[in-house]
Amino acid sequence: AAALQRLREVFDIEELPPDVLPHKKPPQFMVDLFNKVADANGITRAPGLLEGDVVRSFEDRVRVDQYHFYFDISAMEKGEQMLKAEFRVFKLKRTHAFRRSDVKHFCRVEVYELLESGSKPQKKHLIASRLLSLYTEGWEVFNVTQTVSKWVANSNSNHGFLITTTHVFNSRTEHNLVKFAKSQGVLQDSRNALLVLFTNSNKRRSSSFVPSSTSKFTQEHASVSRRPRAASVPSSKSQVTACHRRELYVDFRAIGWSGWIIYPNGYNAFYCRGSCLFPLGESLNATNHATVQSIVHTLKLSQAVSTPCCVPDELKSLNLLYFDDKENVVLKTYKDMVATRCGCH
């Protein structure tokens, strides 16, 4: 129990989310973003591709009004710094053409911040405006960073967005001119509107989960399996004990987290094992300090000096795509989670 609690701290999970998989599907945008940022094992492909280390997606909560969109962003953590906010709506293709030949094929779409709830006429503030074709369909993305920053600072100011459509030909506002995809009932629409926040967690996460071979966690065998085949283990018998990297697979299903972690199913943290005896070869990636320490130990110049330690000296980040405790989908990057190289230090 203590080991699993420690693991939750490493992954910055305060409350375990409910099991929502497989009946609830994540937004395709978030799945595509994960695949762009990480490989199938969650390891970062290209550092710096994302703004910040957390991407949060919130689905539209308004079912009845075709043009009103509301997002509950209360899952944002204290101290989290928002870098960018995107309002993503899927514009549906108009199926019926106008009978009059002189009607133009474009309309103006305007996005407003609602300043009050339920007031008539609606008090609103214009955020963005653009021309769109009536007969095309696809995602429209609006930068709403300034507005959402205000909502984060004061949650009471969040009354959602309103979209209006104005026909360019005669400047008459027609609310049914263009429709946007809305989730209907229990069945989730893959094209449902999203509010996507790119943030920095501003947390110095506790020491990453790359345990040594003698750690308490691995001794308890708490949902971590060491695969028998070592990764890049030296072949000759004289080198077997030298510092090297071995596999250490963290299985989220075995831990009991597979009901809310979307990707990956688990990951290979790897760990370092072996001795750092003099002479330290180039393959041991030894520091100058470690080299001197191994010499002092070998010459027995000091009884108190031990051999250098075999530890990770190169680490990569891990990406998790998961449902939080309010069933919002989050993509989070965790630094220094995978040992890619071992050395004597």
Locate predicted features.
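Secreted, disulfide-rich extracellular signaling modules
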Residues: 1-345
